[in-house]
């Protein structure tokens, strides 16, 4: 068992609970308790809590909005640190967000300020501090396009560091922070947005353009872009609603596979074999000769339709990419469904899907 740290004077103002349930802190509403749960509301409290855990050798779990976590039914034997810092700084087109800021609220404030660049990321659950870790993206925008710097606590050097965009190693749903999750604790994120006289950034995503009645590349009023994306997300159960079990999820559970040229050729052969010579899977250039295809398409064509499942964990009735808790599920129920989907897609198309949420105390 990990050592239970003795509370230090630096943590006297933080909220501290023992044997605290973690399920209410996740959008899945799943997972067992933590040995200790600390809620930090300032950067100093975050750093002090991290240092205390590290100095005592206590396992540490960082929790922001809880929208990207799958916590095991046995919980977490260590300190769970809930980052609840707040702060929205605006200087011209520059925006600085504290890690604990609710992301979708921050997007709304930038739209109200007339700034373009993250309006199509409206409705994504979670906190601002998670966005650079995952390189959050949707509907044609990624935060890597607008982040200028990430301020983080470096657990290796015990210093607060400022990491410029070029050193964040951003790629599809990935970054240096995700690659080395035990090293950095994101404290603040800085963005450079665009003042386009009340207009959005050029609309890149075809579905968004169709919904707006414009061509890809056009600009539209900022508020219209945000509201349209919120509508699209709501229709897929991707905007949190406690009354809608389709939103008791982590959003997209699997990342879209990126295939090499050889893998893509083998995939297309499997598609033709299974679906016929005229079948054409989704394909998007991913750089370096690679191709990205759709995880949702793979899941659907493997026989897992919307609403699939008979137990308390099922595929969303609105979107095949979301696995959901129908109210009485356990984490093991969810993982059993995820494993079934992964195995089915692998058998059908030879592609192994990779989970997007972080797993804690369990493996897929």
From Swiss-Prot:
Q: Which residues form a coiled coil?
A: none
Question: Does the entry feature the keyword Ligase, yes or no?
Answer: no
Query: Which superkingdom heads the taxonomic lineage of this protein's source?
Result: Bacteria
Q: Which Pfam families match?
A: FAD_binding_4, MurB_C
Annotated FAD-binding PCMH-type domain residues: 30-196
- Does the record bear Cell cycle in its keywords? yes
Top-level class of the enzyme under EC nomenclature: oxidoreductase
Q: Where is the active site?
A: 173, 252 (proton donor), 356
EC id = 1.3.1.98
Question: What SUPFAM superfamilies does this protein's entry cite?
Answer: FAD-binding/transporter-associated domain-like, Uridine diphospho-N-Acetylenolpyruvylglucosamine reductase, MurB, C-terminal domain
Query: Which coenzymes or cofactors are required?
Result: FAD
Which reaction(s) does its UniProt entry say it catalyses?
Answer: UDP-N-acetyl-alpha-D-muramate + NADP(+) = UDP-N-acetyl-3-O-(1-carboxyvinyl)-alpha-D-glucosamine + NADPH + H(+)
Annotated compartments: Cytoplasm
| Associated pathway | Cell wall biogenesis; peptidoglycan biosynthesis
Question: Where does this chain mainly localize?
Answer: cytoplasm
Keyword terms: Cell cycle, Cell division, Cell shape, Cell wall biogenesis/degradation, Cytoplasm, FAD, Flavoprotein, NADP, Oxidoreductase, Peptidoglycan synthesis
Write out the GO cellular component annotations: cytosol
**What biological-process terms (Gene Ontology) are attached?**
cell division; cell wall organization; peptidoglycan biosynthetic process; regulation of cell shape
Q: One GO MF term, please? A: FAD binding
Q: What does this protein do?
A: Cell wall formation.
- Protein family (similarity comment): Belongs to the MurB family.
**The protein, known as:** UDP-N-acetylenolpyruvoylglucosamine reductase
**Species for this entry:** Streptomyces avermitilis (strain ATCC 31267 / DSM 46492 / JCM 5070 / NBRC 14893 / NCIMB 12804 / NRRL 8165 / MA-4680)
